[in-house]
């Protein structure tokens, strides 16, 4: 049996971060939205017992058991007693380690495919597996615009009109940011202050965009401020970093305005290792079979590191 789906990228239009908790995690309140940009994920289920394999053509460093997609398949097999071979093939379009959720989305795509292949209808169990794999994975089981709270596992659907974006991703190891680093920088910058998370709001406007991780990350990675300036200079109504970065993005009034800005910025950064993409937020990617996880799932998770 072979199944295929799209694993959409995401951006955090809003990311508010609380103080560290006793368990080492940070509580968040984040407005996450999927994009019309995504990876293609193929999952093949064999008839005989055997291993999980994972290949990412053109990106051999992503092959194998350490890929989140492979981990998701292994946890699915353990939870539901599956022994048959599972082959995963991922055609990557989402930049890697970019704050766009590519790895988490691939993992959720595999879970969606396997749930269909084996007729699994236990949504709570699937959400628990997703949370074991990573904090962002439950969001991608839907996925649709949602407020993510707790560690990211408590999801509340959100009304987000289509937003026309330009994504700017610096493909430079010197600008890479691990999520754990970003949270540590934020904690250090607060100097012991423990701010409360602001409430959710009913409808998104660009003026509400914001990311608590951005100020400390800009201090540690100053070139990101230059990229944000390019977006503002080309008419972005808001420009922020997505997640823990290093991708930054701007919102624009229309798809045409975003496309023009993307072309101009691409010309301005042609001599640098920078990827520029125009994208639009969606209520649901047409290539995704929906699977909404419950509001919460009680399960261990992986810490941000």
Curated annotation (Swiss-Prot):
<feature type="binding site">
    <location>
        <begin position="95"/>
        <end position="105"/>
    </location>
    <ligand>
        <name>ATP</name>
    </ligand>
</feature>
<comment type="function">
    <text>Catalyzes the phosphorylation of the position 2 hydroxy group of 4-diphosphocytidyl-2C-methyl-D-erythritol.</text>
</comment>
<dbReference type="Pfam" id="PF00288">
    <property type="entry name" value="GHMP_kinases_N"/>
</dbReference>
<dbReference type="Pfam" id="PF08544">
    <property type="entry name" value="GHMP_kinases_C"/>
</dbReference>
<feature type="region of interest" description="Disordered">
    <location>
        <begin position="286"/>
        <end position="305"/>
    </location>
</feature>
<feature type="active site">
    <location>
        <position position="136"/>
    </location>
</feature>
<dbReference type="InterPro" id="IPR036554">
    <property type="entry name" value="GHMP_kinase_C_sf"/>
</dbReference>
<keyword id="KW-0547">Nucleotide-binding</keyword>
<dbReference type="GO" id="GO:0016114">
    <property type="term" value="P:terpenoid biosynthetic process"/>
</dbReference>
<dbReference type="GO" id="GO:0050515">
    <property type="term" value="F:4-(cytidine 5'-diphospho)-2-C-methyl-D-erythritol kinase activity"/>
</dbReference>
<comment type="similarity">
    <text>Belongs to the GHMP kinase family. IspE subfamily.</text>
</comment>
<keyword id="KW-0414">Isoprene biosynthesis</keyword>
<dbReference type="InterPro" id="IPR004424">
    <property type="entry name" value="IspE"/>
</dbReference>
<dbReference type="InterPro" id="IPR006204">
    <property type="entry name" value="GHMP_kinase_N_dom"/>
</dbReference>
<dbReference type="GO" id="GO:0005524">
    <property type="term" value="F:ATP binding"/>
</dbReference>
<keyword id="KW-0067">ATP-binding</keyword>
<protein>
    <recommendedName>
        <fullName>4-diphosphocytidyl-2-C-methyl-D-erythritol kinase</fullName>
        <ecNumber>2.7.1.148</ecNumber>
    </recommendedName>
</protein>
<keyword id="KW-0808">Transferase</keyword>
<dbReference type="InterPro" id="IPR020568">
    <property type="entry name" value="Ribosomal_Su5_D2-typ_SF"/>
</dbReference>
<feature type="compositionally biased region" description="Low complexity">
    <location>
        <begin position="290"/>
        <end position="305"/>
    </location>
</feature>
<dbReference type="GO" id="GO:0019288">
    <property type="term" value="P:isopentenyl diphosphate biosynthetic process, methylerythritol 4-phosphate pathway"/>
</dbReference>
<dbReference type="InterPro" id="IPR013750">
    <property type="entry name" value="GHMP_kinase_C_dom"/>
</dbReference>
<feature type="active site">
    <location>
        <position position="10"/>
    </location>
</feature>
<dbReference type="InterPro" id="IPR014721">
    <property type="entry name" value="Ribsml_uS5_D2-typ_fold_subgr"/>
</dbReference>
<comment type="pathway">
    <text>Isoprenoid biosynthesis; isopentenyl diphosphate biosynthesis via DXP pathway; isopentenyl diphosphate from 1-deoxy-D-xylulose 5-phosphate: step 3/6.</text>
</comment>
<keyword id="KW-0418">Kinase</keyword>
């Amino acid at each position: 049996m072979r199944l295929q789906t799209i694993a959409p990228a995401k951006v955090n239009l809003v990311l508010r971060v609380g103080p560290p908790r006793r368990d080492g995690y940070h509580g968040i309140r984040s407005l996450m939205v999927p994009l019309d940009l995504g990876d293609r994920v193929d999952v093949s289920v064999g008839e005989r017992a055997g291993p999980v394999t994972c290949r990412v053509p053109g990106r051999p460093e992503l092959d194998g058991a350490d890929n989140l997609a492979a981990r998701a398949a292994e946890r699915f097999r353990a939870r539901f007693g599956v022994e048959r071979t599972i082959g995963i093939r991922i055609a990557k379009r989402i930049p890697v380690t970019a704050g766009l959720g590519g790895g988490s989305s691939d993992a959720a795509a595999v879970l969606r495919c396997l749930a269909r292949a084996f007729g699994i209808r236990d949504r709570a169990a699937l959400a628990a597996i997703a949370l074991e794999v990573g904090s962002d994975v439950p969001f991608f089981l839907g996925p649709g615009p949602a407020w993510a709270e707790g560690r990211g596992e408590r999801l509340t659907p959100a009304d987000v009109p289509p937003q026309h974006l330009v994504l700017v991703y610096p493909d430079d190891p010197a600008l890479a940011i691990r999520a754990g680093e970003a949270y540590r920088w934020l904690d250090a910058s607060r100097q012991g202050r423990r701010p409360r998370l602001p409430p959710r709001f009913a409808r998104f406007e660009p003026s509400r965009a914001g990311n608590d991780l951005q100020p400390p990350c800009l201090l540690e990675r100053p070139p990101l401020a230059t990229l944000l300036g390019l977006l503002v200079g080309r008419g972005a109504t808001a420009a922020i970093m997505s997640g823990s970065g290093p991708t930054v993005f701007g919102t624009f009034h229309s798809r045409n305005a975003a496309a023009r800005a993307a072309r101009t910025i691409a010309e301005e950064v042609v001599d640098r290792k920078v990827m520029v993409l125009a994208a639009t937020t969606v209520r649901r990617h047409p290539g995704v079979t929906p699977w909404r996880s419950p509001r919460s799932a009680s399960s261990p998770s992986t810490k941000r590191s």
